[in-house]
Amino acid sequence: MSANHSQQLIDAPRFASLTPLIEPRSVAVIGASSDPTRIGGRPIAYMLRHGYAGQILPVNPNRAEIQGLPAFASVAELPQAPDAAIVAVPAPQVLETVRALGRQGARSAIVFSSGFSEVGEAGAAMQDAVVAAAREYGMRLLGPNALGAFNSNLGYYAFFSTSLERGVPLPGRVGIATQSGAYGAHLLGMARERRLGTPICVATGNEADVTLGDSIGWLVESPEIDVVMAYAESIRNVDSFLAALEAAHRAGKPVILHKVGRSALGSRAALSHTASLAGDDKVLDAVLGDYAVIRARTTEELMDIAYLATRRIYPVGNSLGMITVSGGAGIIVSDVAEEVGLPMPPMPDMAQERLKARLSFASPINPVDCTAQALNDLTLVRDFTESMVVDGGYRSLLAFFTQAGTAASIGARLAEQFRRIKEAHPERLFVVSVMGEGEELAPYEEAGFALFEDPTRAVVAIQAMGRFGEAFARPLRLRRPAGGLQLPASTPGEAEAKRLLARAGIESAAEAVLGSAEEAVAFAEGIGYPVVLKLASADIQHKSEIGGVLLGVSDADAVRAGFQLLLRRAAEKAPQARLNGVLVARQLQGGVECFMGIQRDPLFGPVALFGLGGIFVEVLQDVVFRRCPFEVDEAEAMIRSIRGAPLLFGARGRPRADVAALARLLSNLSRFAWEAGERLRSVDLNPVIALPEGQGAWAVDAVLEVEEVADGARS
């Protein structure tokens, strides 16, 4: 391969560079086998059986022919440079094989071989060498330790799973990207049973080069794929992952992610409350919320959401109307809809009256129960459903007709009634819950209905379609490069931290650090009582733990006594701490205590946290997360999303808090964290007091942790 061609491949868009790997015109198989049951033989057998039209080039020094194809003794003897090369040789031979492929001009390699980073340091070093060789020649490399990739639209199977013995993927427009090859094969089998077409799959293995993000990105940019299912155990390359999610949002293509595993952020964050609340799993959820990605809780949910997403109807302002022949099913669906946050508003009063006039013993509220009488007169189904669309205005409709919906006596006629309404309102999402097999379901499938036996699973999937719709309607906000804000060389004390935050628009109540009791009295007299007294020391982060905070100090004598008490407590309980004096601050009266903070996630950078203070944050962990930076409207959405939000909005006769000021403060904090760069480890504002509307929101306590630098260097 020429140096110029190699550079062209490297400079190509990251996702497009996977095309030779997923849509190859020729495939070499290094370590090819005549035995179609062996790892080096299965891909050849699968491609021959399923009509791969490109060239298959087996390489084996001991065979002149493999499975009816001419074989080559070495990579150097290949008659052409393959688009893709399957590497199925022992681990010690992989490096030289990849180098030989590079010299031959191969554009990509799929390394089945194991024995690399998954087995320890020696394997990791060998893997690094393999990747370096691939990059030297501009090759993309899948694996090592990868099950491979397939594109059944081409009959291409660089995939050694036995699952293909049970059948190839059905035609369709759902792609699979998975870090686990075996689990990806399991998804393939489940999709076949669900009659869900998954023609393209990439299993990334060790992700030495090609990542999960690369694979998702290629799939969402493919004109042959509308929906992506992804399975992840960890996010190994955040840049490619986020680039893929941005591509999915631009393309209007849903990504459903099944991310497993739980872990903590790391010991460096132990300084603040923030550290015990944040975790990379919660942070990931917050990041996914910025994009058109839904996280599935189970494999079944992954399948359900992907299946319904293939209808490509993503309602904005989603609401659910249900027509049913079972009042019990209506109750069950209503419960689940409330649990997942899918609105089921009642039908308008006038529409209810018209439906009652048509069938006096019907329940026309929502769910609309047309009773078993509908089986005698199918025009009831038509009229009731039409009213739900036109009068009720529901964006999504769920029809529950159980086994009656596929009965030989009425199934086809019922499907026809629904088909007419669906065709008259193509922008609405229609789902049918019936039981049946094969031909019994055909009238509904031919009309394009999504079918669910379990209506509760349908509700979860319908709710997901609305979340996709809202995400696609919301423009992505691009983040400019971070950095530029100067931080102190080491973790500052509270007063300095507050001064730094104040310059970013994060205000505190009037306060000062004083060196004597009389100075403290003079300042307190000036700002008015009551006041708060705190030890001022960068070495004592959580002062209340040693009795270093005094509240409700109400006169000059109390200030003098409190000043001396704090100094004694510091000497007794923190004798090594460096004291700057005592901080005197105005004590805010009333309001709602809140918590907000920043934690630097090792993958996604600064993440903001918000919740109510006290028991809400410490015990209930009613906290929301969002990746920084964000605007005021997004901050207000965070505030509204916590379970305790009614306390801020005037619940039980309380005065409404100044939520607008609280949102501005939270947004300012997010921008501060973004501009501060990588040296900012965490910020802990606890409490923040949100005073009644129009009176502002103020940071009462502030802990700011920075990564120390030598010789006073600044960021």
What is the meaning of each model-derived region?
Residues M1-S715:
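Catalytic-core regions of core metabolic enzymes
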